[in-house]
């Protein structure tokens, strides 16, 4: 049984877009409360939609969530409101774009104390591209530091709305929520009623249930989906039976039918979330739609890093933990690898730096695995002299320099929003990181948007931390991938007594190789403990050593018992000691402590 058309006209699908910490999840809580989806007593925790501890702690939403609310409006009609919560961070921008595609409208939340930030703008542009109706909302108006008029003029400049169209709320105190509910119903259009067309549903998220397999969250765009239907996924052509379908209040509510305009879930015995790709289209297996919904793409990892257990006998635990994590995170890619220095581990691919930090933190916190992380790096494209192209995500896979024609690296276009007084500092940081400055736009008299193009490899490190510290926390950034460009890159090896330590190798720009090599050798000299023999730490490009530090040997004073006497006696003892040290050096292996691998991560400190 399909939904009657009037129910489609009383449906509103919307999402909330905001920068980190601008109060998005708190506002979602107030909406749940005002629609009686939850009452205050059930709100044992603030931010109901942020399930993971990490989401609450970092104040970010990592996964997209969906929740259905019912609201009786002033006209006496009951409306169905589907709120699709989107991740706000730059690493998850593809997930955001798919969540937006499942909506007709968006609430643009701007913190009245902070103003418009970089990720607000990035996600706003995605919403405008998706053709959504935007309702600007100013949050935290009750705080003494809020600048309501200043922020309102920024919003007006940004999206060209009238001043009275900007709603003012305090999500924490619950001020202005009623007006917001009226605006959602009045200003966001209802979905198109396309029940008569062949089924097409957009997947915007999936979660793993240990008993039911992957639970797919989808928005029905065209047609009707009934329980028991045979469905086909466009991306991989797999066919399943819809065992259970329904809508999401805070718990799953099974239904017999989902029709055009609805947001709900589908359970069909999918073993792996990787088979339910975000952005894919679901259609009927027997009467399929002729083409999928537009916008699907396979998300590729941008940042790679090696994860190794501190204790080599925890390798299996690490494997199991990664398997469990990847059940819920289709964008995590990992393959086993071995390192001479670190033993067995995994090479993992992440969407970006925040994604990498979250995975590492979850491994340590939820699964109790202690890990060593190698330097994060990006995927380089190496064009060989015989015109073959290979992709290198690990410095140890870099071919010999004689075989390389040239190397290309990924570039990103970046927007940085900051106060105008920090422009000089940010320009300096941009130049240090091989950035290409494009232009600056003024948001208002004191805030600017600066546009740069950067090699991704230069910002995966500590760029965000540096940006925050030179702007006293005022700058925010957002970037998007723009393609590969040719660069003069070299592989820098670290040798201990002539033996390369593969886990310390990195790929750097030739102009920075000497400085990096010198700093690294100095840092390692302070970390590697003294041995019974002399240890040479060298940084080399190919066979050419560009920097060297020496750790002197621990030695016993063999002359302590010689009082006076012949010089040749003393020389004989010294020669004997020297000979022994030489023999030790031939058979001895320098143990590299764990801190040495972390030293690269904070080489400037």
UniProtKB/Swiss-Prot annotation:
PROSITE patterns: G_TR_2. Residues 9-192 form the tr-type G domain. It comes from the Bacteria. The keyword Membrane applies. GO terms for biological process: positive regulation of translation. GO terms for cellular component: plasma membrane. It catalyses: GTP + H2O = GDP + phosphate + H(+). Its EC number is 3.6.5.n1. Keywords: Cell inner membrane, Cell membrane, GTP-binding, Hydrolase, Membrane, Nucleotide-binding, Protein biosynthesis. Disulfide bonds: none annotated. InterPro entries: EF-4, EFG_III/V, EFG_V-like, EFTu-like_2, LepA_C_sf, LepA_CTD, LepA_IV, P-loop_NTPase. It is found in: Cell inner membrane. Pfam families: EFG_C, GTP_EFTU, GTP_EFTU_D2, LepA_C. Its main location: membrane. GTP binds at residues 21-26, 139-142. It is an enzyme of class 3 (hydrolase). One of its GO terms (molecular function) is translation elongation factor activity. The keyword Oxidoreductase does not apply. It is a peripheral membrane protein. Required for accurate and efficient protein synthesis under certain stress conditions. May act as a fidelity factor of the translation reaction, by catalyzing a one-codon backward translocation of tRNAs on improperly translocated ribosomes. Back-translocation proceeds from a post-translocation (POST) complex to a pre-translocation (PRE) complex, thus giving elongation factor G a second chance to translocate the tRNAs correctly. Binds to ribosomes in a GTP-dependent manner. Belongs to the TRAFAC class translation factor GTPase superfamily. Classic translation factor GTPase family. LepA subfamily. This is Elongation factor 4. The lineage of its organism: Bacteria, Pseudomonadati, Chlorobiota, Chlorobiia, Chlorobiales.
